[in-house]
Every structure is written in structure tokens, then in C-alpha cells.
Design a protein with these regions (language model features):
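NAD(P)H-binding glycine-rich loop region in Rossmannoid oxidoreductase-like domains
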Residues: 30-95, 99-102
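Conserved dinucleotide-binding and phosphotransfer motif residues
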Residues: 24, 44, 145
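Structural motif
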Residues: 3, 69-70, 107
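Conserved beta-strand positions in the Rossmann-like core of class I SAM-dependent methyltransferases
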Residues: 5, 29, 49, 150
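Glycine-/Pro-rich loop/turn segments that contact NAD(P) or position catalytic residues
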Residues: 77-169
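Cofactor-binding loop segments of dinucleotide-utilizing enzymes, especially the Rossmann-like FAD-
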Residues: 9, 33, 113
Length: 169
């Protein structure tokens, strides 16, 4: 089974995925920023590690991913803060790809969004621009990396029951 490092471990997607991964026999190391979230992740079956993605270097990411065979990126700042979107959705994601290439990790799963492409047509004046541009850049780096990758590009995320409908691009 895989040894997965899951960035953004306390986010909604990660909290739904973690028990499924653990039940399937995978080991999940869950990277979180807030130490108050450790107990909740232990309860889900993850091995939590507290780290601030905005402060990690490529070497810092390398230390975290060492011993894992898969990176799952579910971290994201969203559109609330432009500086955090650039720092997490672009810089930290790209650093994790670079660390994977230096280390032994060859599989990468990115949770992105359905409009993630360089020609996304989001106006630079739109509050969503930094997030959309950061995601587009990170996804492009992943595609060009040579890693065995999957980019999951959902539209709207909801708490509705799973429909089972997934389209492959």
C-alpha cells in the first residue's frame, strides 16, 4: 500500500479522503498548520504533522516528503487573501513538486479547480484572480514535471452525497 503525505490535512476534502485512504490500507501523513487540529486527524487515522506551508523551503518540503511515495495536495488559501493564494496555491505547491523531483516521490495528486488553465479568463481585478492564476501555474508545473500525476479539477464542492459522476479530461 502507499505511504501518502496529504497537504492541507484539515481541509474538507482531506478530512473526507483520509478515512477512505486509511480504510483502503494506506498510511496517511497529514500536514496541518494548527496544532489544535492534531486530535481530530488522529481520530481519522492520520499521522498529523504541524508545518506552516507559507514558511517551508524546497528543502523543508523534502524533509516532510521523505519516506512517502505519494503527495496529495489539498491545501489552498482560496480567494480570501491574494498573498496567501500566491504563497500556498502557487509557491508552496511548486516547492512540493520540486522536492518530489529531488527526492524519491513519483506520484502526485493535486486538488485543483475546473477552470485551472493559463487562459482562465479571470480578470486581474477580480478577487479570484490570484487563486486562479496560482492554481494554473502550479498545475502547469505538475504537468511539465515528469511525475506520475493526477489533477482533480472539481467544479463546485458541496456536502451533497457523492453522485459517482466523474469525467476524465
Amino acid at each position: 500500500m502507499s505511504r501518502i503525505i496529504l497537504f492541507g490535512g484539515h481541509g474538507h476534502v482531506a478530512r473526507l479522503a483520509t478515512p477512505l485512504l486509511v480504510q483502503a490500507g494506506h498510511t496517511v501523513t497529514s500536514i496541518i498548520r494548527n496544532p489544535d487540529q492534531v486530535a481530530a486527524l488522529v481520530e481519522l487515522g492520520a499521522e498529523p504533522v504541524v508545518a506552516d506551508l507559507e514558511k517551508l523551503t524546497i528543502e523543508g518540503f523534502g524533509g516532510l516528503i521523505d519516506g512517502h511515495d505519494t503527495i496529495a495536495w489539498a491545501a489552498g488559501a482560496g480567494s480570501g487573501s491574494p498573498s496567501r493564494a500566491w504563497a500556498i496555491d502557487r509557491d508552496a505547491a511548486v516547492y512540493s513538486v520540486q522536492a518530489a523531483l529531488i527526492g524519491d516521490v513519483r506520484r502526485y495528486l493535486m486538488v485543483s479547480w475546473s477552470g485551472s488553465r493559463i487562459d482562465h479568463r479571470i480578470a486581474q481585478t477580480d478577487d479570484f484572480f490570484p487563486y486562479s492564476q496560482a492554481k494554473a501555474i502550479a498545475d502547469s508545473v505538475i504537468r511539465d514535471s515528469g511525475l506520475d500525476y493526477t489533477i482533480v479539477a472539481p467544479g463546485r464542492l458541496t456536502n451533497d452525497p457523492a453522485s459517482g459522476g466523474v469525467e476524465r479530461a
